[in-house]
């Protein structure tokens, strides 16, 4: 739900959708947090924690970062991924991340769920790019290893595995806005990037006055005015200063990526 509200805000400009997403995230953090930055399903999880709950919040934090550029959300997404790696790791290499770290009963040991592993690949691969951290790329690769086994990949309704494989093997479209948050042109470029939001896309905003470590390792030229860059796995655009040009820039990059 949080990710859906973020997408609605991005493409429509509905600020109330972002407010709802942020309130939902705050409520879950307040009432469902676990030690170690995971999340529980209810007030008590007799058989938990469950992979799906922390995975959903990791996805939510990453989408909130994408629309707000608030790096606190990016850090929270990373902590969720760390919890997943620590608590739901495959019981054997290539066996898939398990749904729960606790047996539901003696006859039903923890097992992997295909859809959860698909979602994990897509989340972890995007996060790996967003923070330039190989640990999350390895997390995605391990989940993909399970999905690629013939007994899993050839089951009916396997289109999600193709999406996961595509996300894991290709870098997301990477839009970066350079400019101070109070500069009208930088704000307009960010809004244009949100309205043109594509699947498997990362939006980053760099404030020249912010000297904290950057999440990604892509270098850009120093400019004396706000600008937007769009990068693929192989190239970056020239700086764009006109918000109205952004949709066409994204469409062209999507075409070249296919």
Residue ranges of each PLM-predicted region?
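Glycan-recognition and catalytic cores of secretory/periplasmic carbohydrate-active enzymes
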Residues: 1-258
């Amino acid at each position: 739900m949080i990710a859906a509200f973020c997408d609605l805000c991005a493409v429509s400009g509905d600020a109330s959708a972002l407010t709802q997403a942020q309130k939902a995230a705050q409520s879950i953090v307040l009432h469902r947090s676990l030690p170690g930055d995971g999340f529980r399903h209810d007030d008590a999880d007799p058989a938990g924690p469950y992979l799906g709950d922390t995975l959903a919040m990791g996805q939510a934090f990453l989408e909130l970062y994408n629309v707000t550029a608030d790096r606190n959300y990016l850090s929270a997404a990373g902590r969720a991924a760390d919890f997943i790696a620590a608590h739901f790791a495959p019981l054997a290499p290539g066996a898939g991340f398990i749904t729960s770290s606790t047996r539901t009963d003696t006859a039903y040991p923890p097992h992997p769920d295909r859809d959860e592993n698909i979602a994990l690949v897509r989340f972890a691969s995007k996060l790996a790019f967003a923070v330039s951290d190989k640990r999350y790329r390895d997390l995605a690769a391990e989940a993909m290893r399970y999905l690629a086994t013939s007994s899993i990949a050839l089951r009916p309704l396997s289109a999600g595995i193709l999406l996961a494989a595509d996300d894991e093997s290709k870098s997301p479209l990477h839009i970066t806005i350079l400019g101070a948050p109070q500069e009208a042109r930088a704000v307009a470029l960010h809004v244009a990037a949100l309205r043109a939001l594509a699947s498997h896309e990362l939006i980053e905003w760099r404030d020249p006055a912010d000297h904290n470590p950057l999440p990604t390792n892509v270098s850009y030229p120093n400019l004396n005015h706000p600008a937007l860059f769009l990068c693929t796995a192989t190239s970056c655009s020239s700086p764009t200063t006109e918000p109205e040009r952004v949709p066409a820039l994204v469409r062209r990059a999507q075409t070249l990526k296919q």
